[in-house]
């Protein structure tokens, strides 16, 4: 059996990161986390301990600070793989503050790759996004679909990161999985962890549930003239626990099968769901949610 060493998770207290930690621990991986809680809460790590029975070692630091980052690798020289989630991710904010997004998302990646080279880490899973496909001319997309012009600086940071990783693998002994996933949804069945961003949520499900719980007065549906069955925007949603398990599978692929270089994997359900269908789904109903149709001035993730 391959000794898989220790896995570093960046953004371990975040939505997808926390669910991935659960899945990795269930599959006998040892993990440590880096998260400065810029868009998450320490309580997520406390709940992970309740859920798994294991205390999560976390380092509260900024990944753009290379000297502080290197201290983690010096202390944990048995790190054998990295899953990189940590990034600024709000599309609309990235349009308003592009330099903030380019500086943070790219410099954090550069520093991690510097550490990969210095500390001989050869397995890297990157949290990419279906946003790299832009406004694709042909649907559904697959891993060979050409990348179109990015629709936001956030999406462009994902495109740039993929290119950097592809170039990096050409001259270094490293294996990379690029996971392009669609829209994560849901929460762990325990209810202890889920999507809990700071500030006003920009993903559709927290806005819907927040409206149901009375945290928001109304749920605004942006756009009602799309070429869809009910005129509202359609997205491919995938349960966050499935995405989390995909990262475990990607790591196993790197350790056991993959050769040096990049492998690209899309992660989605393959089925589109409109905003109105999502409102009507399961416990939600149009009778219990006050919603308003509006213009396409904003898009939920």
Model-predicted regions and their roles:
Residues 102, 151-159, 194-202, 206, ...:
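Short-chain dehydrogenase/reductase
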Residues 64, 89, 101, 200, ...:
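Glycosyltransferase donor-binding loop in the core domain
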Residues 42-44, 183-203, 214-235:
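Short, flexible, glycine-rich and Lys/Arg-enriched loop motifs at helix boundaries
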Residues 61, 65, 197-201, 271:
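Residue-level signature of the cytosolic catalytic core of signaling kinases
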Residues 96, 137-138, 144-146, 159, ...:
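Short capping/connector residues at structural and topological boundaries
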Residues 207-301:
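C-terminal substrate-binding subdomain of Rossmann-fold SDR/epimerase-dehydratase oxidoreductases
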Residues 1-187:
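N-terminal Rossmann-like NAD(P)+-binding domain of SDR-like oxidoreductases, especially those catalyzing
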Residues 107-110, 159, 163, 202, ...:
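A structural signal for well-ordered alpha-helical segments within the folded catalytic domains
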